[in-house]
Amino acid sequence: MRLIMLAVVLTISITGLVSGQSAKQRAAIEQEIRRLDVAHADAVLRGDLAALDKIWTRDFKVNNPFNEIDKADRIRTGAVTYASFIRVPESVLIHGDTVIVMGREEVVPKGNSPDAGKTINRRYTNIWMKRSGKWRLIARQASVICQK
């Protein structure tokens, strides 16, 4: 009986330790992804293609607010630039080496960009994957929130 009780106590204790480590790992991943998600928005704002190439995978795709699926061609060519880009990650879902981030964005396009000078509110979803030990943005979707 004592052996059974000891086994139960040890099992509960070990399970608690493993869960604690898992929670710490998940918290660290979430913190890293939130940092990268905001860094991505900052690189887009600055038009920093070198930084974006370190964030995006080679096969990165975006379902953009212009109803197109592309490789961020509008950003790469400078057809879309921003005076302001605020991103607020609201939900981070961790599934192994894949993380899905959902939230809202407020952007103000500039120059010859469509809707230049207007404040545009959007919802977004970013999909991050760990590749070769680094978190990279593999896909993104952004939709303009209808104005009333």
Description of each model-found segment:
Residues 5-16:
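Bacterial N-terminal signal peptides
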Residues 21-148:
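A beta-strand edge to alpha-helix "cap/lid" segment located at domain peripheries
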